[in-house]
C-alpha cells in the first residue's frame, strides 16, 4: 500500500508574546477508504511569463478527472521577488474565478480539490515577470 503524507510546521519565536509552533501531518488516502493513494496525474512545472489570466488546470483536458475522487493540488511560486505575485483562483477564466490565494515569490499552497465540480484552477500573475 502506498503511503503519502503532507506535513506543515510553522514555528516562530517572535510572532506573539510566547514562542509558537504549529505542526500537522495528513495521510493522503483514496476517497472513501483508508488506502493510500494509488494514482497520480504526476507533477508538472509551468513557467508563467504573462499577466493574462490562464488556466493552470483545465478539468476538461484531464481524462477521468470528473469522478468524485480525493484530488490534491500543490502550487508553488518559484520566483524570488517578494513584490511579484500570482493570484490563484477556482472557476472559468471567461467568468470571474473565485480567488483562493495570492502567492508571492517562494510562497506555496496545498489544497483538496473536487474534480467533480468541473471548475478549473486559474492563475493571474501581477505582471509579465517570468516565474
Please report, for each region that a protein language model flagged, where it lies by residue:
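Short carbohydrate-recognition loop motifs
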Residues: 44-49
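Short, surface-exposed beta-strand/strand-loop-strand elements in extracellular ectodomains
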Residues: 67-98
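Surface-exposed ligand/attachment interfaces on beta-rich extracellular proteins
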Residues: 27-38, 50-67, 93-95, 127-130
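Noncatalytic modules at the cell exterior or secretory-pathway interfaces
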Residues: 112-131
Amino acid at each position: 500500500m502506498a503511503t503519502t503524507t503532507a506535513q506543515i510546521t510553522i514555528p516562530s519565536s517572535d510572532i506573539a508574546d510566547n514562542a509558537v509552533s504549529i505542526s500537522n501531518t495528513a495521510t493522503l488516502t483514496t476517497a472513501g477508504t483508508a488506502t493510500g493513494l494509488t494514482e497520480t496525474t504526476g507533477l508538472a512545472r509551468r513557467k508563467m511569463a504573462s499577466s493574462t489570466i490562464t488556466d493552470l488546470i483545465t478539468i476538461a483536458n484531464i481524462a477521468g478527472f470528473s469522478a468524485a475522487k480525493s484530488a490534491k493540488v500543490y502550487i508553488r511560486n518559484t520566483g524570488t521577488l517578494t513584490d511579484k505575485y500570482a493570484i490563484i483562483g477556482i472557476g472559468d477564466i471567461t467568468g470571474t474565478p473565485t480567488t483562493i490565494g495570492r502567492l508571492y515569490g517562494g510562497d506555496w499552497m496545498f489544497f483538496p480539490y473536487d474534480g467533480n465540480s468541473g471548475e478549473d484552477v486559474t492563475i493571474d500573475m501581477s505582471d509579465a515577470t517570468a516565474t
